[in-house]
């Protein structure tokens, strides 16, 4: 829901965050119509991130709802290699690596039953991305 955009911007401007992200795993979030497979896949991916990066500083790597400060835009975006589904994860991991402050806000999330995400190929690309980032951490 785009009305939450103001909450993201407020996290940056009023709470001194460098990046604010929506999190479906925030305790105050509401998630609707999520299939068991999508929930499992999402939780497994986030668990894998925590295994590879024990200190990530965020719970939900791919909500896809974020706002960044001018500082991140200027100093970090050019370091991100991925321009597909792994972009969000890479943005968060590099933000943590370089000491930027990450804030998560709750969201109201309704799953799209008509999603065109190819789970297997996306998962393979994401795992490769995680390994690439880990090797350069």
What are the language-model segments listed below?
Residues 2-83, 112-121:
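Acceptor/aglycone-binding surface of glycosyltransferases and processive sugar-polymer synthases
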Residues 7, 47, 90, 126-129:
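Alpha-helical elements of Rossmann-like donor-binding domains used by nucleotide-donor carbohydrate transfer enzymes
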Residues 20, 69, 95, 105, ...:
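Residue-level signature of catalytic and energy-coupling elements of molecular machines
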Residues 98-137:
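C-terminal catalytic/acceptor-binding lobe
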């Amino acid at each position: 829901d785009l009305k939450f955009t103001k909450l993201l911007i407020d996290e940056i401007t009023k709470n001194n965050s460098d990046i604010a992200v929506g999190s479906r795993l925030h305790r105050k979030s509401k998630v609707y119509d999520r299939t068991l497979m999508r929930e499992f896949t999402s939780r497994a991916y986030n668990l894998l991130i925590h295994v590879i990066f024990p200190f990530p500083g965020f719970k939900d790597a791919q909500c896809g709802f974020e706002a960044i400060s001018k500082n991140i835009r200027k100093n970090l975006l050019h370091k991100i290699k991925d321009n597909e589904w792994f972009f969000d994860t890479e943005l968060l991991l590099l933000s943590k690596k370089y000491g930027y402050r990450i804030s998560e806000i709750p969201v109201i999330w309704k799953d799209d039953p008509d999603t065109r995400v190819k789970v297997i190929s996306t998962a393979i690309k994401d795992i490769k991305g995680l390994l690439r980032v880990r090797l350069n951490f």
